[in-house]
C-alpha cells in the first residue's frame, strides 16, 4: 500500500470524526442558555426569573410546593423539587430535531384549618415543627408525577449552534430565527414578594388578582391564606413570630417596565408576643387574695417530645413589688381598755428594702392614720391570727405583797353577731384577771430579789350563756351583758426587788399539802366500810 493511500484514509477518518463532534445550543423561550455537545451534552434549561419555585413541607396536612417539568419523547424531566430548583436537565440528543416543546408548572398547597389544634398551638406557642427526612422523601415521591399546567409562550429547544449569536438556527434550517425571539420586546415583567405590617394592609381584600398576557389572555390567581414570619420590636428588643396572612397584588409601571408586587398582610385577629406586657397577678395571704397589675417580660422555653418541638412563652413579672398606692383602706383591729373589734381605716404605705446574701427583698407596710375610730380606742399593731381567730395581746401589771407581776392577756377579737331582735353588736373580750395556776408558788415576801421570768397567758372567748356577776362584761346593745369564759396560765412573772433582807422567800405550800394529806387519809378509812354496805 502506498504511503499516499494511508494518508488519504487517515484524513478521511479525521474529517469524519470532526463532523461527528457537533455543538448545539440550548434555548429557553428562544434565548440561548447553554452550548453543549450534541452526543454527550446535557442542556441545563433554566426557568425564567419571573417564575418562582419553592418547597415548604410541614406535614401531609400543611405544605406549599411549586416546581416545573417537561416531557421529551414520553420521558418526564423535573426540576429539583426538594431544593426548589429552577433548572430542567435534558440530554441534548433527545431533544435535538424535535422542535420546541413546552414546559409545565405544578403548584400544590394545603393549609391547616384555622381552628385546628396544631394551628392554635402554633399561634399561641410559636411552635416550629420538625419534619423527618423520610417523610419528605415519601411526599416528593407521591407528587413528582403530578400533572401540571403548560405555560403559554414558554418553550424549550435544542438547535444548531451559531457562533456569535445569542439565538441559534433551528435544526435543519439555515435561516436565523432572531426575528422570532422575544429579545426585541419593549416591556418586561418583574415579580417580587414583600411582607409588611398589618397597618398597610387595611385596604387589601381577598379578591383575586388578574393579569393580561400579550395575546389578550387573562390569568386569574386565587389569593390563599399563607403563614408568614413577621418581626416585632419594642423597647429595643425584637423577636420573630409566625402568623397567617393573605396576599394582595399591586402593579406599577416605570419606564415601560411592569412590576407586580405581592404583599402578604398578617391577619389582625392573631396576637403577637410582646417584649413587655402589663399582666394581672393575684397575691394571697392569710386566706385573703387581691389582684394587682405589674409589668412582665416574655420567657421562651422549648421542649422536644417524640420529635415534636414545642415552644412555650411565659410572661414573668419584672418585679414582685405590687403597685404602691398613696392611700389604701385596710382592715384593722381597734381596742379600748376592755374589748377589741375589727374595723376599716385609711392607711399610708411605708416601703422597706432588705438585702440578705445578695437577694434584695422589698416590703410594703400600710400604717393606719389617726388614733382610732372612736374616742378612747387605739389600733392594735401586734394582732395574731390562729385557726381563723384573731387575738390581741394586752399587758397588765399586778402588785401583790410587794411583788409586781406583768401578765399578758390575749383578747379574742369577735366579729359582729346578730341578737335576738335582728340587731348586731360587737362584743369585746375583757383582759382576763391574772390568777395563779393551781400549784404555782406564791410571790416572794418583802425584801426578796427578782427571780423567775414567766408569762401569764389568758385565753378568753365571748359565748352566749348564763350570766353571773363574776363572768359578765358590758358590751352588748342597750346595756346587754355578754358571757365570757376565760382560761389563765402563768408564763412570765417579774418579782420586784425590795429593801430589807437579801434572802428570797420560799413558799412550801404546807397548808395545801396538809389539806391534800387529810383527804387521802379519809378516803383510806372509808374503804373497809364499802364491804358492809
Curated annotation (Swiss-Prot):
Summary of the knockout phenotype: Leads to increased adhesion and biofilm formation.
Annotated lipid attachment (GPI-anchor amidated glycine): 511
Sorted alphabetically, the keyword list is: Cell adhesion, Cell wall, Glycoprotein, GPI-anchor, Lipoprotein, Membrane, Secreted, Signal
Which residues get removed as pro-piece?
Answer: 512-533
Q: Does the keyword Acyltransferase apply?
A: no
Topology in the membrane?
A: Lipid-anchor; GPI-anchor
PTM description: The GPI-anchor is attached to the protein in the endoplasmic reticulum and serves to target the protein to the cell surface. There, the glucosamine-inositol phospholipid moiety is cleaved off and the GPI-modified mannoprotein is covalently attached via its lipidless GPI glycan remnant to the 1,6-beta-glucan of the outer cell wall layer. Cleaved by SAP9 and SAP10, which leads to its release from the cell wall.
Could you say which protein family the record assigns here?
Answer: Belongs to the flocculin family.
Concerning what turns on (or off) its expression, the entry says: Expression is greatest during yeast exponential-phase growth, but down-regulated in stationary phase and upon filamentation. Expression is also increased during growth in hypoxic conditions. Expression decreases in biofilm cultures and becomes undetectable through late stage biofilm formation. Up-regulated when the extracellular phosphate concentration is low or in presence of Cis-2-dodecenoic acid (BDSF). Repressed during cell wall regeneration. Expression is positively regulated by EFG1 and EFH1, and negatively regulated by SSN6 and SSK1.
Protein location? Secreted; Secreted, Cell wall; Membrane
Lineage here is: Eukaryota, Fungi, Dikarya, Ascomycota, Saccharomycotina
Its signal peptide is 1-21
What protein does this entry describe?
Yeast-form wall Protein 1
Kindly report the protein's main subcellular placement as a broad class.
Answer: secreted
Indicate, by first and last residue, each region the UniProt record lists as having compositional bias (Low complexity). Answer: 163-214, 427-451
Amino acid at each position: 500500500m502506498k504511503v499516499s493511500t494511508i494518508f488519504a484514509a487517515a484524513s478521511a477518518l479525521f474529517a469524519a470524526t470532526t463532523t461527528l463532534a457537533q455543538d448545539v445550543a440550548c434555548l429557553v423561550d428562544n434565548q440561548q442558555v447553554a452550548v453543549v455537545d450534541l452526543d454527550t451534552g446535557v442542556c441545563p434549561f433554566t426557568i425564567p426569573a419571573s417564575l418562582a419555585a419553592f418547597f415548604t413541607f410541614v406535614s401531609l396536612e400543611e405544605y406549599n410546593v411549586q416546581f416545573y417539568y417537561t416531557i421529551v419523547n414520553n420521558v418526564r424531566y423535573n426540576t429539583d423539587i426538594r431544593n426548589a430548583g429552577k433548572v430542567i436537565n435534558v440530554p441534548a440528543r433527545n431533544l435535538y430535531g424535535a422542535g420546541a416543546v413546552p414546559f409545565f408548572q405544578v403548584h400544590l398547597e394545603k393549609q391547616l384549618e384555622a381552628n385546628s389544634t396544631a394551628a392554635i398551638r402554633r399561634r399561641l406557642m410559636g411552635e416550629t415543627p420538625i419534619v423527618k427526612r423520610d417523610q419528605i422523601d415519601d411526599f416528593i415521591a407521591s407528587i413528582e408525577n403530578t400533572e401540571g399546567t403548560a405555560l403559554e409562550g414558554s418553550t424549550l429547544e435544542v438547535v444548531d449552534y451559531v457562533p456569535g449569536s445569542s439565538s441559534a438556527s433551528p435544526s435543519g434550517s439555515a435561516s436565523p430565527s432572531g426575528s422570532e425571539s422575544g429579545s426585541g420586546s419593549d416591556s418586561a415583567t418583574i415579580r417580587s414578594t414583600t411582607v409588611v405590617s398589618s397597618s398597610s394592609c387595611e385596604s387589601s381584600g381577598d379578591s383575586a388578582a388578574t393579569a393580561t398576557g400579550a395575546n389578550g389572555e387573562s390569568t386569574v390567581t386565587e389569593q390563599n391564606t399563607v403563614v408568614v414570619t413577621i418581626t416585632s420590636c419594642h423597647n429595643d428588643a425584637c423577636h420573630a413570630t409566625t402568623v397567617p396572612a393573605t396576599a394582595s397584588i399591586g402593579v406599577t409601571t416605570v419606564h415601560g417596565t411592569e412590576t407586580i408586587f405581592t404583599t402578604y398582610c398578617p391577619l389582625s385577629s392573631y396576637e403577637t408576643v410582646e417584649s413587655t406586657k402589663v399582666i394581672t397577678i393575684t397575691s394571697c395571704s392569710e386566706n385573703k387574695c387581691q389582684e394587682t397589675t405589674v409589668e412582665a417580660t416574655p420567657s421562651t422555653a422549648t421542649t422536644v417530645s417524640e420529635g415534636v418541638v414545642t415552644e412555650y412563652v411565659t410572661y414573668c413579672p419584672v418585679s414582685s413589688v405590687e403597685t404602691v398606692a398613696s392611700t389604701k383602706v385596710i382592715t384593722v383591729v381597734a381596742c379600748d381598755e376592755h374589748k377589741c373589734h375589727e374595723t376599716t381605716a385609711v392607711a399610708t404605705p411605708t416601703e422597706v428594702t432588705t438585702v440578705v446574701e445578695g437577694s434584695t427583698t422589698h416590703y410594703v407596710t400600710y400604717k393606719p392614720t389617726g388614733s382610732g375610730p372612736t374616742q378612747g380606742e387605739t389600733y392594735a399593731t401586734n394582732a395574731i391570727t390562729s385557726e381563723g381567730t384573731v387575738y390581741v395581746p394586752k399587758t397588765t401589771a399586778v402588785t401583790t405583797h410587794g411583788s409586781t407581776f406583768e401578765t399578758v392577756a390575749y383578747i379574742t377579737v369577735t366579729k359582729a353577731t346578730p341578737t335576738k331582735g335582728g340587731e348586731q353588736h360587737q362584743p369585746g373580750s375583757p383582759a382576763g384577771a391574772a390568777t395563779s395556776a393551781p400549784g404555782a408558788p406564791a410571790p416572794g415576801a418583802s425584801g426578796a430579789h427578782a427571780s423567775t421570768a414567766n408569762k401569764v397567758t389568758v385565753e378568753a372567748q365571748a359565748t352566749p350563756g348564763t350570766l353571773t356577776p363574776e363572768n359578765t362584761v358590758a358590751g352588748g346593745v342597750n346595756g346587754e351583758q355578754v358571757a365570757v369564759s376565760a382560761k389563765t396560765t402563768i408564763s412570765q412573772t417579774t418579782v420586784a426587788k425590795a429593801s430589807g433582807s437579801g434572802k428570797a422567800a420560799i413558799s412550801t405550800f404546807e397548808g395545801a399539802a396538809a389539806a391534800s394529806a387529810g383527804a387521802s387519809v379519809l378516803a383510806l378509812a372509808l374503804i373497809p366500810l364499802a364491804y358492809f354496805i
